[in-house]
């Protein structure tokens, strides 16, 4: 066989199916759109589910893709084996009610044996036990040796998940060994031994399984095939694992270079290098597709992968930041197929660098705490770390659960995962109750998401805010209805509408719908999971009926304010690019009638000067009264014209480009003002950080901006009145008062210090002796942490062989400190252990070294009990 690189294989596959009249689609982003069942895209067909289910019409009945995928189910095996990985590419061709078995089987054989040139005597085919049709096609329409076809049962060659669409499949296998297998038993044995490997699965979706277990023929039969690019690359390159194929090997070589480790010489180092290679690739693609590190959802998947790779870098001796340098190797090997990697490389590097820096801080503190837990377990001869302690590490210190588990496993210890999950569940319940979760659009099973795919609503609301239409669907949360009556709430679809459905960060329109028999208010307009325009309504008079002619009227004043904010968002985006640099890209937005919110990529808080420049630039462009122009063009034309595209969006071939004079040009389907002058005024309300490398600006326009300025002005007047000065002197007056307060605080601190001075002699009067070790405890009032440490140090200096534990109620908060003489340590004294137990009594925590430790608490009423606890702990330590 001729050697073929992974990039060449990808192109050959897609070109082959293009020659069979398939539409080639670019890979969908890893973040699913309108699919709450998936965290990340994990299969080639996953983003095409709406086409298979009939919720959406496909752009063509024949489609081919190379879909990037992430799977983390076997993450614990990644690195330990040579075939597990979290990132992979799935080659696929799909038919939605077009061709079926008699076409795809010979095409598959043609591609494998002719295009790729794989020897026929190295191939085997499996089919479902009873699929005679597939057997007949294989033997009549290809020249496969019939003795190389094996029939297998449901577990191997039938695809189904519960009830619903399902069907048999045929799989194509490659034999890495010598000789021929003659029987099913020999075939299965060779497969189990990894001598024979499956590399292409052709699924024939031809049945609909009902609740009774009956398999009913589908009217529309589909084809869904999947061939892992990495798997076929191992075959075409004559290697036996994914880390040896050209693209991945190049990235692994980069990992070796950055860690100064050699691959193939040490088993443990090889594991670390494979983890860094795989995870470095995954995090690059995830960040490119808009995922940000966080503690939940897909953001946590990213954080987990990144931190796992960073830790294995440390195991290889890397001291500083290095993972961001892996991006170059990923871009070099995947940049031609995924050009967005090249465009976002600098941004990806910065996000990784920020997260790795953050992790280095986390891992240092977290490792200290975990190792102290492990030391305690070893002292007590315990083998299981409590779930509560692991959860505290995770929740309070940001230490990843998986890292805790890995380190425990390395030490031969276990984790009480059941109680960890219990703690996690309780925390999620608290969070859920706090935010009051709701699902506005209902579940995928609700009627609103079961509207027939053939129903189409024409949007005619860019200019028209009122038009006549016909009701084609009515319903509520439980069922479709022919009529909705006064007082009832539900949803309504029409054949055309002026109502904009929430999309691209812009909220949906509100308004009303009237007919001869009644009237309803439109509380919102959204698209369902199938992309249909859905009007959410409440009938306030009479009734609305299916099939009726109705008049739809958008709230014009509200729409006008939304348009001002949306156009201003585009102008803000461009202004940020001009002031901060081209690395600025939209990360999210929200536009309603009151304000706008814009999230963007940047790596530091904006200075006051930068904010002023951005605000001034937007207002200058508003004053030019530039025409806001919209044009439809092809995606390539839009890109070539310099229009800004969002990396995580999937665009159609025809796109809408919105331009504000010669200042801003973006792809956008939203509604806008006719000219920039309509915005009137733009005012930034706030600037903040929302994630690593992501900043957020909130702003107002028009009358809202004037009201905001008026509010600020009134606040200034009120402040001037309270300070008894002119508005222009407010800053000076505040600075003067701040200086006065600082001086008074200094005087108070000096007075407190004088009160504490000399107190050590009084404290020493209560000294007790425990097995030859002196113990001094005392409760004080209104002594800050620094003064308490100074006092403890003075008391310690007057001890021969002992420990002092002091506690202070300082404004309702407890300060604790323990100090011990060096010779007392030999008697078993350990301040860190003492203070930990003492702090728990006052509702706090802390720790430290054997000779000095400090902590805090929130229950000063328990200080006396805490000091009694100190005595108990010292008695145990110095037995």
Curated annotation (Swiss-Prot):
Q: What is its EC number?
A: 6.1.1.7
Q: Which catalysed reactions does the entry list for this protein?
A: tRNA(Ala) + L-alanine + ATP = L-alanyl-tRNA(Ala) + AMP + diphosphate
Check the record and name the InterPro entries matching this protein.
aa-tRNA-synth_II/BPL/LPL (IPR045864), Ala-tRNA-lgiase_IIc (IPR002318), Ala-tRNA-ligase_IIc_anticod-bd (IPR018162), Ala-tRNA-synth_IIc_core (IPR018165), Ala-tRNA-synth_IIc_N (IPR018164), Ala-tRNA_ligase (IPR050058), Ala_tRNA_ligase_euk/bac (IPR023033), DHHA1_dom (IPR003156)
Cellular component terms (Gene Ontology): cytosol
Protein localization: Cytoplasm
Q: Which terms does the record give in the GO molecular function aspect?
A: alanine-tRNA ligase activity; aminoacyl-tRNA deacylase activity; ATP binding; catalytic activity, acting on a protein; transferase activity; tRNA binding; zinc ion binding
Which branch of life, at top level? Bacteria
Binding of Zn(2+) occurs at 566, 570, 668, 672
What functional role does this protein have?
Catalyzes the attachment of alanine to tRNA(Ala) in a two-step reaction: alanine is first activated by ATP to form Ala-AMP and then transferred to the acceptor end of tRNA(Ala). Also edits incorrectly charged Ser-tRNA(Ala) and Gly-tRNA(Ala) via its editing domain.
Name of the protein: Alanine--tRNA ligase
Recorded source organism is Clostridium perfringens (strain ATCC 13124 / DSM 756 / JCM 1290 / NCIMB 6125 / NCTC 8237 / Type A)
Gene name as annotated: alaS
């Amino acid at each position: 066989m001729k050697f073929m690189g992974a990039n060449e294989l990808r192109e050959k596959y897609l070109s082959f199916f293009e020659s069979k009249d398939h539409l080639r689609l670019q890979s969908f982003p890893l973040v699913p759109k309108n699919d709450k069942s998936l965290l990340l895209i994990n299969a080639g067909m996953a983003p095409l589910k709406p086409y298979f289910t009939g919720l959406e019409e496909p752009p063509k009945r024949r489609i081919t893709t190379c879909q990037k995928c992430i799977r983390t189910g076997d993450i614990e095996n990644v690195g330990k084996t040579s075939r597990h990985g979290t990132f992979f590419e799935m080659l696929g061709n799909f038919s939605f009610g077009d061709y079926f078995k008699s076409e795809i089987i010979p095409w598959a054989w043609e591609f494998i044996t002719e295009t790729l040139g794989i020897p026929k005597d190295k191939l085997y085919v499996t089919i479902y036990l009873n699929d005679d049709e597939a057997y007949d096609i294989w033997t009549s329409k290809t020249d496969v040796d019939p003795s190389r076809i094996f029939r297998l049962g449901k577990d191997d060659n039938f695809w189904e998940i519960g009830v619903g669409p399902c069907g048999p499949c045929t799989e194509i296998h490659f034999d890495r060994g010598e000789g021929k297998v003659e029987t099913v038993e020999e075939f299965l044995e060779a497969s189990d031994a990894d001598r024979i490997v499956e590399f292409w699965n052709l699924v024939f979706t031809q049945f609909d399984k009902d609740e009774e277990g009956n398999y009913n023929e589908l009217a529309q039969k589909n084809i869904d095939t999947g061939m892992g690019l990495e798997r076929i690359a191992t075959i075409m390159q004559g290697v036996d694992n994914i880390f040896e194929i050209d693209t991945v090997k190049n990235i692994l070589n980069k990992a070796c270079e950055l860690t100064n480790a050699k691959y193939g010489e040490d088993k443990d180092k090889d594991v670390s290098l494979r983890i860094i290679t795989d995870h470095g690739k995954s995090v690059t693609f995830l960040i490119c597709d808009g995922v940000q590190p966080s503690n939940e959802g897909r953001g946590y998947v990213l954080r987990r992968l990144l931190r796992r790779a960073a830790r294995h870098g440390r195991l290889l001796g890397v001291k500083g930041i290095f993972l961001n340098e892996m991006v170059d190797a990923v871009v070099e090997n995947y940049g031609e197929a995924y050009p967005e990697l090249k465009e976002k490389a600098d941004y990806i590097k910065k996000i990784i660098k920020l997260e790795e820096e953050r992790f280095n801080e986390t891992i240092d503190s977290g490792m200290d705490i975990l190792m102290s837990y492990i030391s305690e377990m070893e002292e007590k001869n315990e083998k299981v770390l409590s779930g509560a302690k692991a959860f505290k590490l995770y929740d309070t210190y940001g230490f990843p659960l998986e890292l805790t588990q890995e380190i425990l496993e390395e030490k031969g210890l276990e984790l009480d995962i059941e109680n960890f999950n219990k703690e996690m569940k309780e925390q999620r319940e608290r969070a859920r109750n706090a935010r009051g979760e709701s699902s506005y659009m209902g579940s995928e099973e609700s009627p609103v998401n079961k509207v027939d795919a053939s129903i189409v609503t024409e949007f005619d609301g860019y200019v028209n805010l009122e038009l006549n239409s016909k009701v084609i669907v009515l319903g509520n949360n439980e069922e479709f209805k022919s009529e909705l009556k006064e007082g009832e709430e539900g949803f309504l679809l029409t054949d055309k509408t002026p109502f904009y459905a929430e999309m691209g960060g812009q909220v949906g329109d509100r308004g009303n719908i009237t007919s001869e028999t009644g009237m309803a208010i439109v509380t919102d307009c959204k698209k369902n999971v199938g992309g249909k325009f859905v009007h959410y309504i409440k009938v306030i008079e009479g009734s609305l009926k299916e099939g009726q002619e109705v008049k739809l009227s958008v709230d014009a004043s509200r729409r006008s304010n939304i348009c001002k904010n949306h156009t201003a968002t585009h102008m803000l985006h461009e202004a940020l690019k001009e002031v901060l640099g081209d690395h600025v890209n939209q990360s999210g937005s929200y536009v309603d009638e009151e304000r706008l919110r814009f999230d963007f990529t940047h790596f530091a808080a904006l200075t006051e000067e930068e904010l002023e420049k951005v605000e001034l630039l937007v207002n200058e462009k508003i004053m030019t009264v530039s025409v806001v122009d919209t044009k439809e063009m092809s995606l390539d034309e839009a890109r070539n014209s310099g229009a800004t595209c969002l990396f995580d969006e999937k665009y159609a071939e025809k796109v809408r480009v919105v331009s504000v004079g010669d200042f801003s040009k973006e792809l956008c389907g939203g509604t806008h003002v006719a000219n920039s002058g309509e915005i009137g005024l733009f005012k930034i309300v706030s600037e903040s950080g929302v994630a690593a490398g992501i900043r957020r600006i909130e702003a107002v326009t028009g009358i809202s901006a004037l009201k905001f300025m008026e509010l600020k002005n009134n606040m200034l007047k009120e402040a001037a009145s309270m300070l008894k000065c002119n508005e222009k002197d407010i800053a000076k007056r505040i600075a003067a008062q701040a200086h006065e307060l600082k001086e008074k605080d200094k005087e108070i601190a000096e007075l407190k210090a004088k009160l504490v001075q000399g107190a050590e002699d009084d404290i020493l009067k209560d000294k007790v002796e425990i097995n030859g070790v002196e113990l001094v405890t005392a409760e004080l009032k209104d002594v800050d942490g620094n003064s308490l440490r100074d006092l403890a140090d003075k008391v310690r200096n007057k001890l021969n062989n002992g420990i002092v534990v002091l506690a202070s109620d300082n404004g309702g908060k407890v300060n604790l400190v323990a100090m011990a003489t060096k010779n007392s340590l030999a008697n078993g004294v350990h301040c860190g252990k003492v203070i930990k137990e003492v702090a728990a009594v006052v509702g706090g925590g802390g720790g430290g070294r054997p000779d000095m430790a400090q902590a805090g608490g929130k229950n000063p009423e328990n200080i006396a009990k805490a000091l009694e606890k100190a005595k108990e702990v010292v008695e145990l330590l110095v037995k």
